[in-house]
Amino acid sequence: MKLAKTRFRPAPRELDLNIDYRVAATGLPRPSDFARWVGAALQGRSRPAQIGLHVVDNAEGQRLNAEYRGKDSATNVLSFALNEGEEAVAGLPLMGDIVLAAEVVAREAAEQGKDLHAHYAHLTVHGMLHLQGHDHETDTEAEAMEALETVILARLGYTDPYAVEH
């Protein structure tokens, strides 16, 4: 089910963001919100980026999570770097896709007492950091990634997303 597709080009030479809303849900961020969050996560990068951002339902989120991660449940965010493992080549864009499962994001925000848009901002930044090579497989990596997310979100005017959980 494809509901709406928006191509947002805030700075054509720097960011080509294709937003694909595949679910009708209340409280979804606007394309300009996603563009601001993606742009903040890219701050300081000199190479351009081509990003696909897909907002999906639980069924599609579960299918993708099972297919690519071997986990048979929907998750909040998935990231797919199209040039993963390749060296950054001058002039070539960072390319990848971020998938957000709207129902999972809304449920988590409610359960954790978080503002829905703040949670979308956090997960969008989290996904963008994965596309740029950040990970959280070890405690050290997780701490570094969480710290970077917190700094980026603070610049956007959001509180520490981990303060609620710790």
From Swiss-Prot:
GO terms for MF: metalloendopeptidase activity; RNA endonuclease activity; zinc ion binding
Compartments, record wording: Cytoplasm
Residues that coordinate or bind Zn(2+): H126, H130, H136
Annotated InterPro entries: MetalPrtase_cat_dom_sf_prd, YbeY, YbeY_CS
Main location, first listed in the record: cytoplasm
Function description: Single strand-specific metallo-endoribonuclease involved in late-stage 70S ribosome quality control and in maturation of the 3' terminus of the 16S rRNA.
Protein name in UniProt: Endoribonuclease YbeY
Species the sequence originates in: Laribacter hongkongensis (strain HLHK9)
Protein's gene: ybeY
